[in-house]
Amino acid sequence: TVNVYGADWCGDCKRAKAALTQYGVAFVWHDIETEEGAEEKAIEISNQKHIPVVTFADNTFMVEPSATQIKAKLESLGILQ
């Protein structure tokens, strides 16, 4: 499962969600402004306060990834060809 921790006002978060949607990858959105514990979880994962934090099924994460970085990661996991 792909998880995205971010906020509606965050441009990088919108780009990450758009990239995942474009690639046809289902993800779970965690809004750090409204979901209890989401902000703390994002900080716990990345040890920083930057968003978005995107987590992947192989227990890795990316902070503020570009669409190209997301695509490369999905390809490395075999999710995209």
Question: Could you describe each region identified by the protein language model?
Answer:
Residues 1-3, 26-28, 58-60:
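Short active-site oxyanion
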Residues 1-23:
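Local sequence-structure signature of Cys/Sec-based thiol-disulfide redox active-site neighborhoods
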Residues 11, 36-37, 69:
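Short alpha-helical
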Residues 25-39:
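Thiol-based oxidoreductase modules, predominantly thioredoxin-like and allied folds used
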Residues 39-45, 74:
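Short amphipathic alpha-helix with an adjacent loop that forms part of the alpha/beta core around
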Residues 45-54:
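Structural micro-motif
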Residues 56-81:
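Non-catalytic, surface beta->alpha helical segment in thiol-disulfide oxidoreductase systems
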